[in-house]
Amino acid sequence: MREIVHLQIGQCGNQIGAKFWEVISDEHGIDIAGNYCGNASLQLERINVYFNEAYSHKYVPRSILVDLEPGTMDSVRSSKIGPLFRPDNFIHGNSGAGNNWAKGHYTEGAELIENVMDVVRNECESCDCLQGFQLIHSLGGGTGSGMGTLLINKIREEYPDRIMNTFSVVPSPKVSDTVVEPYNAILSIHQLIENTDETFCIDNEALYDICFRTLKLTNPTYGDLNHLVSLTMSGVTTSLRFPGQLNADLRKLAVNMVPFPRLHFFMPGFAPLTARGSQQYRALSVPELTQQMFDARNMMAACDPRRGRYLTVACIFRGRMSTREVDEQLLSVQTKNSSYFVEWIPNNVKVAVCDIPPRGLKMAATFIGNNTAIQELFIRVSEQFSAMFRRKAFLHWYTGEGMDEMEFSEAEGNTNDLVSEYQQYQDATADVEEYEEAEASPEKET
């Protein structure tokens, strides 16, 4: 089977990760002791993608939990889903990274990284045919961002031909935990541009907006936000976990979604959006799902897709529905809104249909868009970064761990280059003559 090794790192990564395992073990009929108690053969058909089958039909998540302080790990271990995980796969330091990227990447994290790599190797050895890794982390703290990117680099060195997929929680201006978030985020983005194949950008601000506007929650907790993220993650990984009519693995997803290697930052979306514990009263039709799924308010990244253009899109529909109807709906979205899709990539919307809906819903749809508007997210963080970096504010915390100012300038430059690349492809047209003229008369440099 094509296995995926799952890594969750830092406080945010572990909290979302625990929720993710709760959702998918439920979908596959695995109870908290790791025993199968479902009733559909489809649940077991591709269970090996995320679970190891241990002795006497016990299923154990192929998951590695990492943090630089014991707190979050202890709460995951003692939560109701704790017994499901393999005890050896909990790896933690005791010092913490103190929201400092340099501690996670160069000092504290670097001391722990070999222990993590041993567990990674161990997990990879028990795979028949490893397809890749997925890592959940946030970019605003110290461990998820600093040590997370260090781990990505190490895995890249050792398994260069395997897909590296990340779910990265990007800091947002309205919901800030620490002042140095922009530093940590830009230093991480610099690494993600070079070393990952696919990055799903999840944004706390967008999640809060969904909770306030759509779900009408007055004071949303991190639990509510994590619920939304786990819905999306479960949706994105559906076609990897269940047999369906158009099955994707991580590599096929990357081939369909990434037209240029650096432009691999996706906006996820989900429909229908429901609050935790609430049931949906009526089933949505395929046209309603499609319309909601492309709606800016359903996006998990705080960018407006209408201000950019889609390079590529992947949609995953779940539930019993007619594939033909799904195809017709998506075709109509493309023809009615053709200006929002770049014309130089024909057929840039791909669809997968899986018969098993998520718990509590008859039908659902997950959206993955590679839209040039994602640059708004990078511009936002980059502006905050520059404001502090120009005054060298808080820099001593980083240089004290052995970092150099050059690294900051380099990361900022790389992020700004990424923004220009997105802008360039947003403005690009399919006119061949125009392109040839530009080639023929190179502009004179002033």
Curated annotation (Swiss-Prot):
Tubulin is the major constituent of microtubules, a cylinder consisting of laterally associated linear protofilaments composed of alpha- and beta-tubulin heterodimers. Microtubules grow by the addition of GTP-tubulin dimers to the microtubule end, where a stabilizing cap forms. Below the cap, tubulin dimers are in GDP-bound state, owing to GTPase activity of alpha-tubulin. Its main location: cytoplasm. InterPro entries: Beta-tubulin_BS, Beta_tubulin, Tub_FtsZ_C, Tubulin, Tubulin/FtsZ-like_C, Tubulin/FtsZ_2-layer-sand-dom, Tubulin/FtsZ_GTPase_sf, Tubulin_C. Dimer of alpha and beta chains. A typical microtubule is a hollow water-filled tube with an outer diameter of 25 nm and an inner diameter of 15 nM. Alpha-beta heterodimers associate head-to-tail to form protofilaments running lengthwise along the microtubule wall with the beta-tubulin subunit facing the microtubule plus end conferring a structural polarity. Microtubules usually have 13 protofilaments but different protofilament numbers can be found in some organisms and specialized cells. One of its GO terms (biological process) is microtubule cytoskeleton organization. GTP binds at residues 11, 69, 138, 142-144, 204, 226. Residues 430-440 have a biased composition (Acidic residues). Belongs to the tubulin family. Its cofactor is Mg(2+). The keyword Lyase does not apply. Highly expressed in bone marrow. A motif (MREI motif) lies at residues 1-4. Residues 419-446 are annotated as: Disordered. GO terms for cellular component: cytoplasm; microtubule. The MREI motif is common among all beta-tubulin isoforms and may be critical for tubulin autoregulation. It is found in: Cytoplasm, Cytoskeleton. It holds the Pfam family Tubulin. Disulfide bonds: none annotated. One of its GO terms (molecular function) is GTPase activity. Keywords: Cytoplasm, Cytoskeleton, GTP-binding, Magnesium, Metal-binding, Microtubule, Nucleotide-binding. Mg(2+) binds at residue 69. This is Tubulin beta-6 chain. PROSITE patterns: TUBULIN, TUBULIN_B_AUTOREG. It comes from Gallus gallus (Chicken). The keyword Zinc does not apply.
